[in-house]
Amino acid sequence: MLRTGLFLIFLLLSSVFCLEDSTEEFEEHLSIKSLKDGRVAFSFTFKTLLRDAIPRDPRTLAFDNDDSQHYTLFPLTLGQILRQYAITELHLTLNAGKWNYDAWGYPDEPDVGVGAELRAWMAGDSISSIDDRWQGVRNALAGLFCASLGSLDEQRTTSPRSTFPPEGALPDWENLTPFLKLLPCKSRSGLAMLLNPHRIFDADWHGIGLHVIWRPEGVEVRLSVQLVSDPLRISGQKKQDWSFSSLFDRKVEKACPVAKSSRVSVELPSSGVYRVYPEPPQVKDGIAYYDLKNANEVWDIGTMWPTDFEYPLSKPNPALVPFSVRRNLLGSTQDRGQLSIVLTNNEQDVLQLLYLETMPWIIQFYLHTIRVHADDALRDDLISNISYILPIPHARPATFESVLTLPGRSTVTFTMDVAKAFLRYTEHPPDAQRGWDLPPAIFTPLRQSSHNSTNLGKRVYSPSLLVDLATPDFSMPYNVIIFTCSVVAFIFGSVFNVLTRKFIVVRLEPQKRSESSPSKNLDSDESGKPDTSKSDVH
């Protein structure tokens, strides 16, 4: 027994030494921010770095000679997908809810569009090879995250020209459970212990993301979880007190042993009286830092407010974002409409935005109807660099890119007429008709330059839209079938009775006829008059 215990200790020590000498590093970080409307934003980030790794050459995909991959901290299933399809950069986000930029500001992870968004960079010699690999990547990630990413086919796939530049160096959701399996410590230790599915999916907004970036030092995999919780709604009280146990129903009981660093940063509110517990060991630039790596204790970080929370009645001043977006699809008919976008510049300086609109083929743009107004004055000069990819019915979406210029402290309105397509009756979903969801538009601030425009700020996603298409009366065939079946059944029954029954004439004899006739209470003569004669009884 003693020998077995020593052997286990030797294995543990050897594994620790191997981890220290390994080329793989794992870090985790949690950022917490109290919002103006009483909510709290949480941003979990889990980074894994595989040093000295390079992407696979796409020319070697035809040969089955790729070396076997052995990982200690790097997710094996994800590494196999990256090698199998020779992916240079990958971004996948799954979000639910609407991010309120005006009240919450910019998120830590900019990809907050509603639904699923998948971006990948792949090198190749032919378009057919890239299309086949793209389909394989979609199916592989759909199986890995238990998500319906296979529906992101050619009808929902596009290649924007300028909106999504690669972030790394390019060389010469039930989704939460599979997400946690990609972490070295799973959800048994570290910050991942706070990821309670019941509380995350109950948040006002939540999203998970997977980001693979090839850097000069190696490949970096960043797994992120963002959510916005409302402590006032969860607690049922009028105070915005929050803690790990109250919002997640869990605490950080132990640190992840393989993490190089495990930190929690809490952005302290700029106003009000409150108390942060436990006492932060380091406060810098209004942010409290906690190091969970070297502390062997149970962590339940939170804040307490002595007074009741009062909801703000006006927008934050100054504005949390440089511009605001409102997007609508106008029109009451089911064959035509108008796309309307209202942009408000909250700053004094002129602002340029890179505008990307991706619509499924069921919505067609009329570019000659584009109108741009600035403070109710026609200003078509505020739009430039228009790029448009025509949609192909049942095959490719429409992609519209342009640069919009917003004068300082102004409101710019962009309008464009659209046409709504007619679908086949087999293309309508089998469930109740609620309309068709349209993806959000994306706006990226640009810096004005004498040579070119470079990305300046984070992307801003507009709310998604719902379009009402012409829907056939699916109840009419059922009514016709029921009416026809009723008529056929009635006629068939009558004809069947006529053909199967045998009619016989029965003649009754006079005696039997009299016996069978009912007796009468009064006697009558042949003339029908009553008998009035009397007789004596002796």
Q: Where in this protein do the model-derived segments appear?
A:
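Cleavable N-terminal signal peptides of Sec/SRP-targeted secreted and luminal proteins
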Residues: 2-18
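Long, solvent-exposed N-terminal ectodomains/accessory regions
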Residues: 16-247
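Low-complexity, intrinsically disordered segments enriched in Ser/Thr together with acidic residues
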Residues: 133, 226-231, 236-247, 252-257, ...
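Edge strands and adjacent loops of beta-rich recognition modules
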Residues: 295-339
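Short beta-strand elements of extracellular/lumenal beta-sandwich folds
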Residues: 331-359
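A surface/secretory-pathway sequence property marking extracellular, secreted
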Residues: 362-419
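Cytosolic-side membrane-insertion boundary helix
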Residues: 417-488
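Cytoplasmic C-terminal tails of single-pass
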Residues: 504-538
